[in-house]
């Protein structure tokens, strides 16, 4: 079993109406044989296991060996701009799944994909201007600090 240091929260940067089939098609179009997430949560709150936790996925460059990747479907508005548009069902399911994962991996840090960006000013915080990307379009660290 691999050592898990992180549980990364992602958004799919896709319409909220998408399901697993649409996501798999996009991954295939990008040249990936398998989805980059271990779990995906659709707008109705359903948790879809995509890959076994023991498999290394391509969710966060440089951290994949030690990360479980979880995504909610959505994260962009009609113009493609990043937005936290999680449904109430997604919020509830995401919290429950992250709690279960953190129970299995109690030393893992729960954070958003954007929080893996380098802290270029070394103040201990990834400031908005330091972020390589906005995913998951909300601040996951304080939201799940109680888990």
Features from the language model and the residues they span:
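Short, conserved "active-site rim" segments that organize catalytic pockets and cofactor/ligand binding
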Residues: 1-55, 133
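Short, flexible loop/turn motifs enriched in small residues
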Residues: 33, 63-65
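Flexible, surface-exposed loop/gating regions in the mature catalytic domains
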Residues: 56-60
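Ligand-binding face of N-terminal immunoglobulin V-set domains in extracellular IgSF glycoproteins
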Residues: 70
């Amino acid at each position: 079993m691999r050592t898990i240091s992180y549980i990364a929260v992602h958004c799919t940067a896709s319409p909220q109406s998408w399901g697993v089939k649409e996501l798999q098609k996009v991954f295939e179009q990008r040249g990936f044989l398998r989805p980059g997430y271990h779990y995906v949560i659709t707008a109705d709150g359903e948790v879809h296991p995509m890959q076994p936790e023991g498999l290394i996925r391509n969710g966060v460059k440089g951290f994949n060996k030690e990360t479980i990747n979880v995504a909610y479907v959505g994260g962009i508005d009609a113009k493609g701009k990043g937005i936290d548009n999680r449904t109430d069902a997604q919020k509830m399911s995401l919290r429950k799944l992250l709690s279960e994962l953190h129970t299995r991996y109690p030393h893992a840090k729960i954070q958003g994909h954007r929080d893996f960006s380098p802290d270029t000013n070394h103040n201990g915080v990834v400031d908005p201007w330091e972020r390589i990307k906005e995913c998951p379009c909300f601040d996951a660290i304080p939201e799940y600090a109680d888990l």
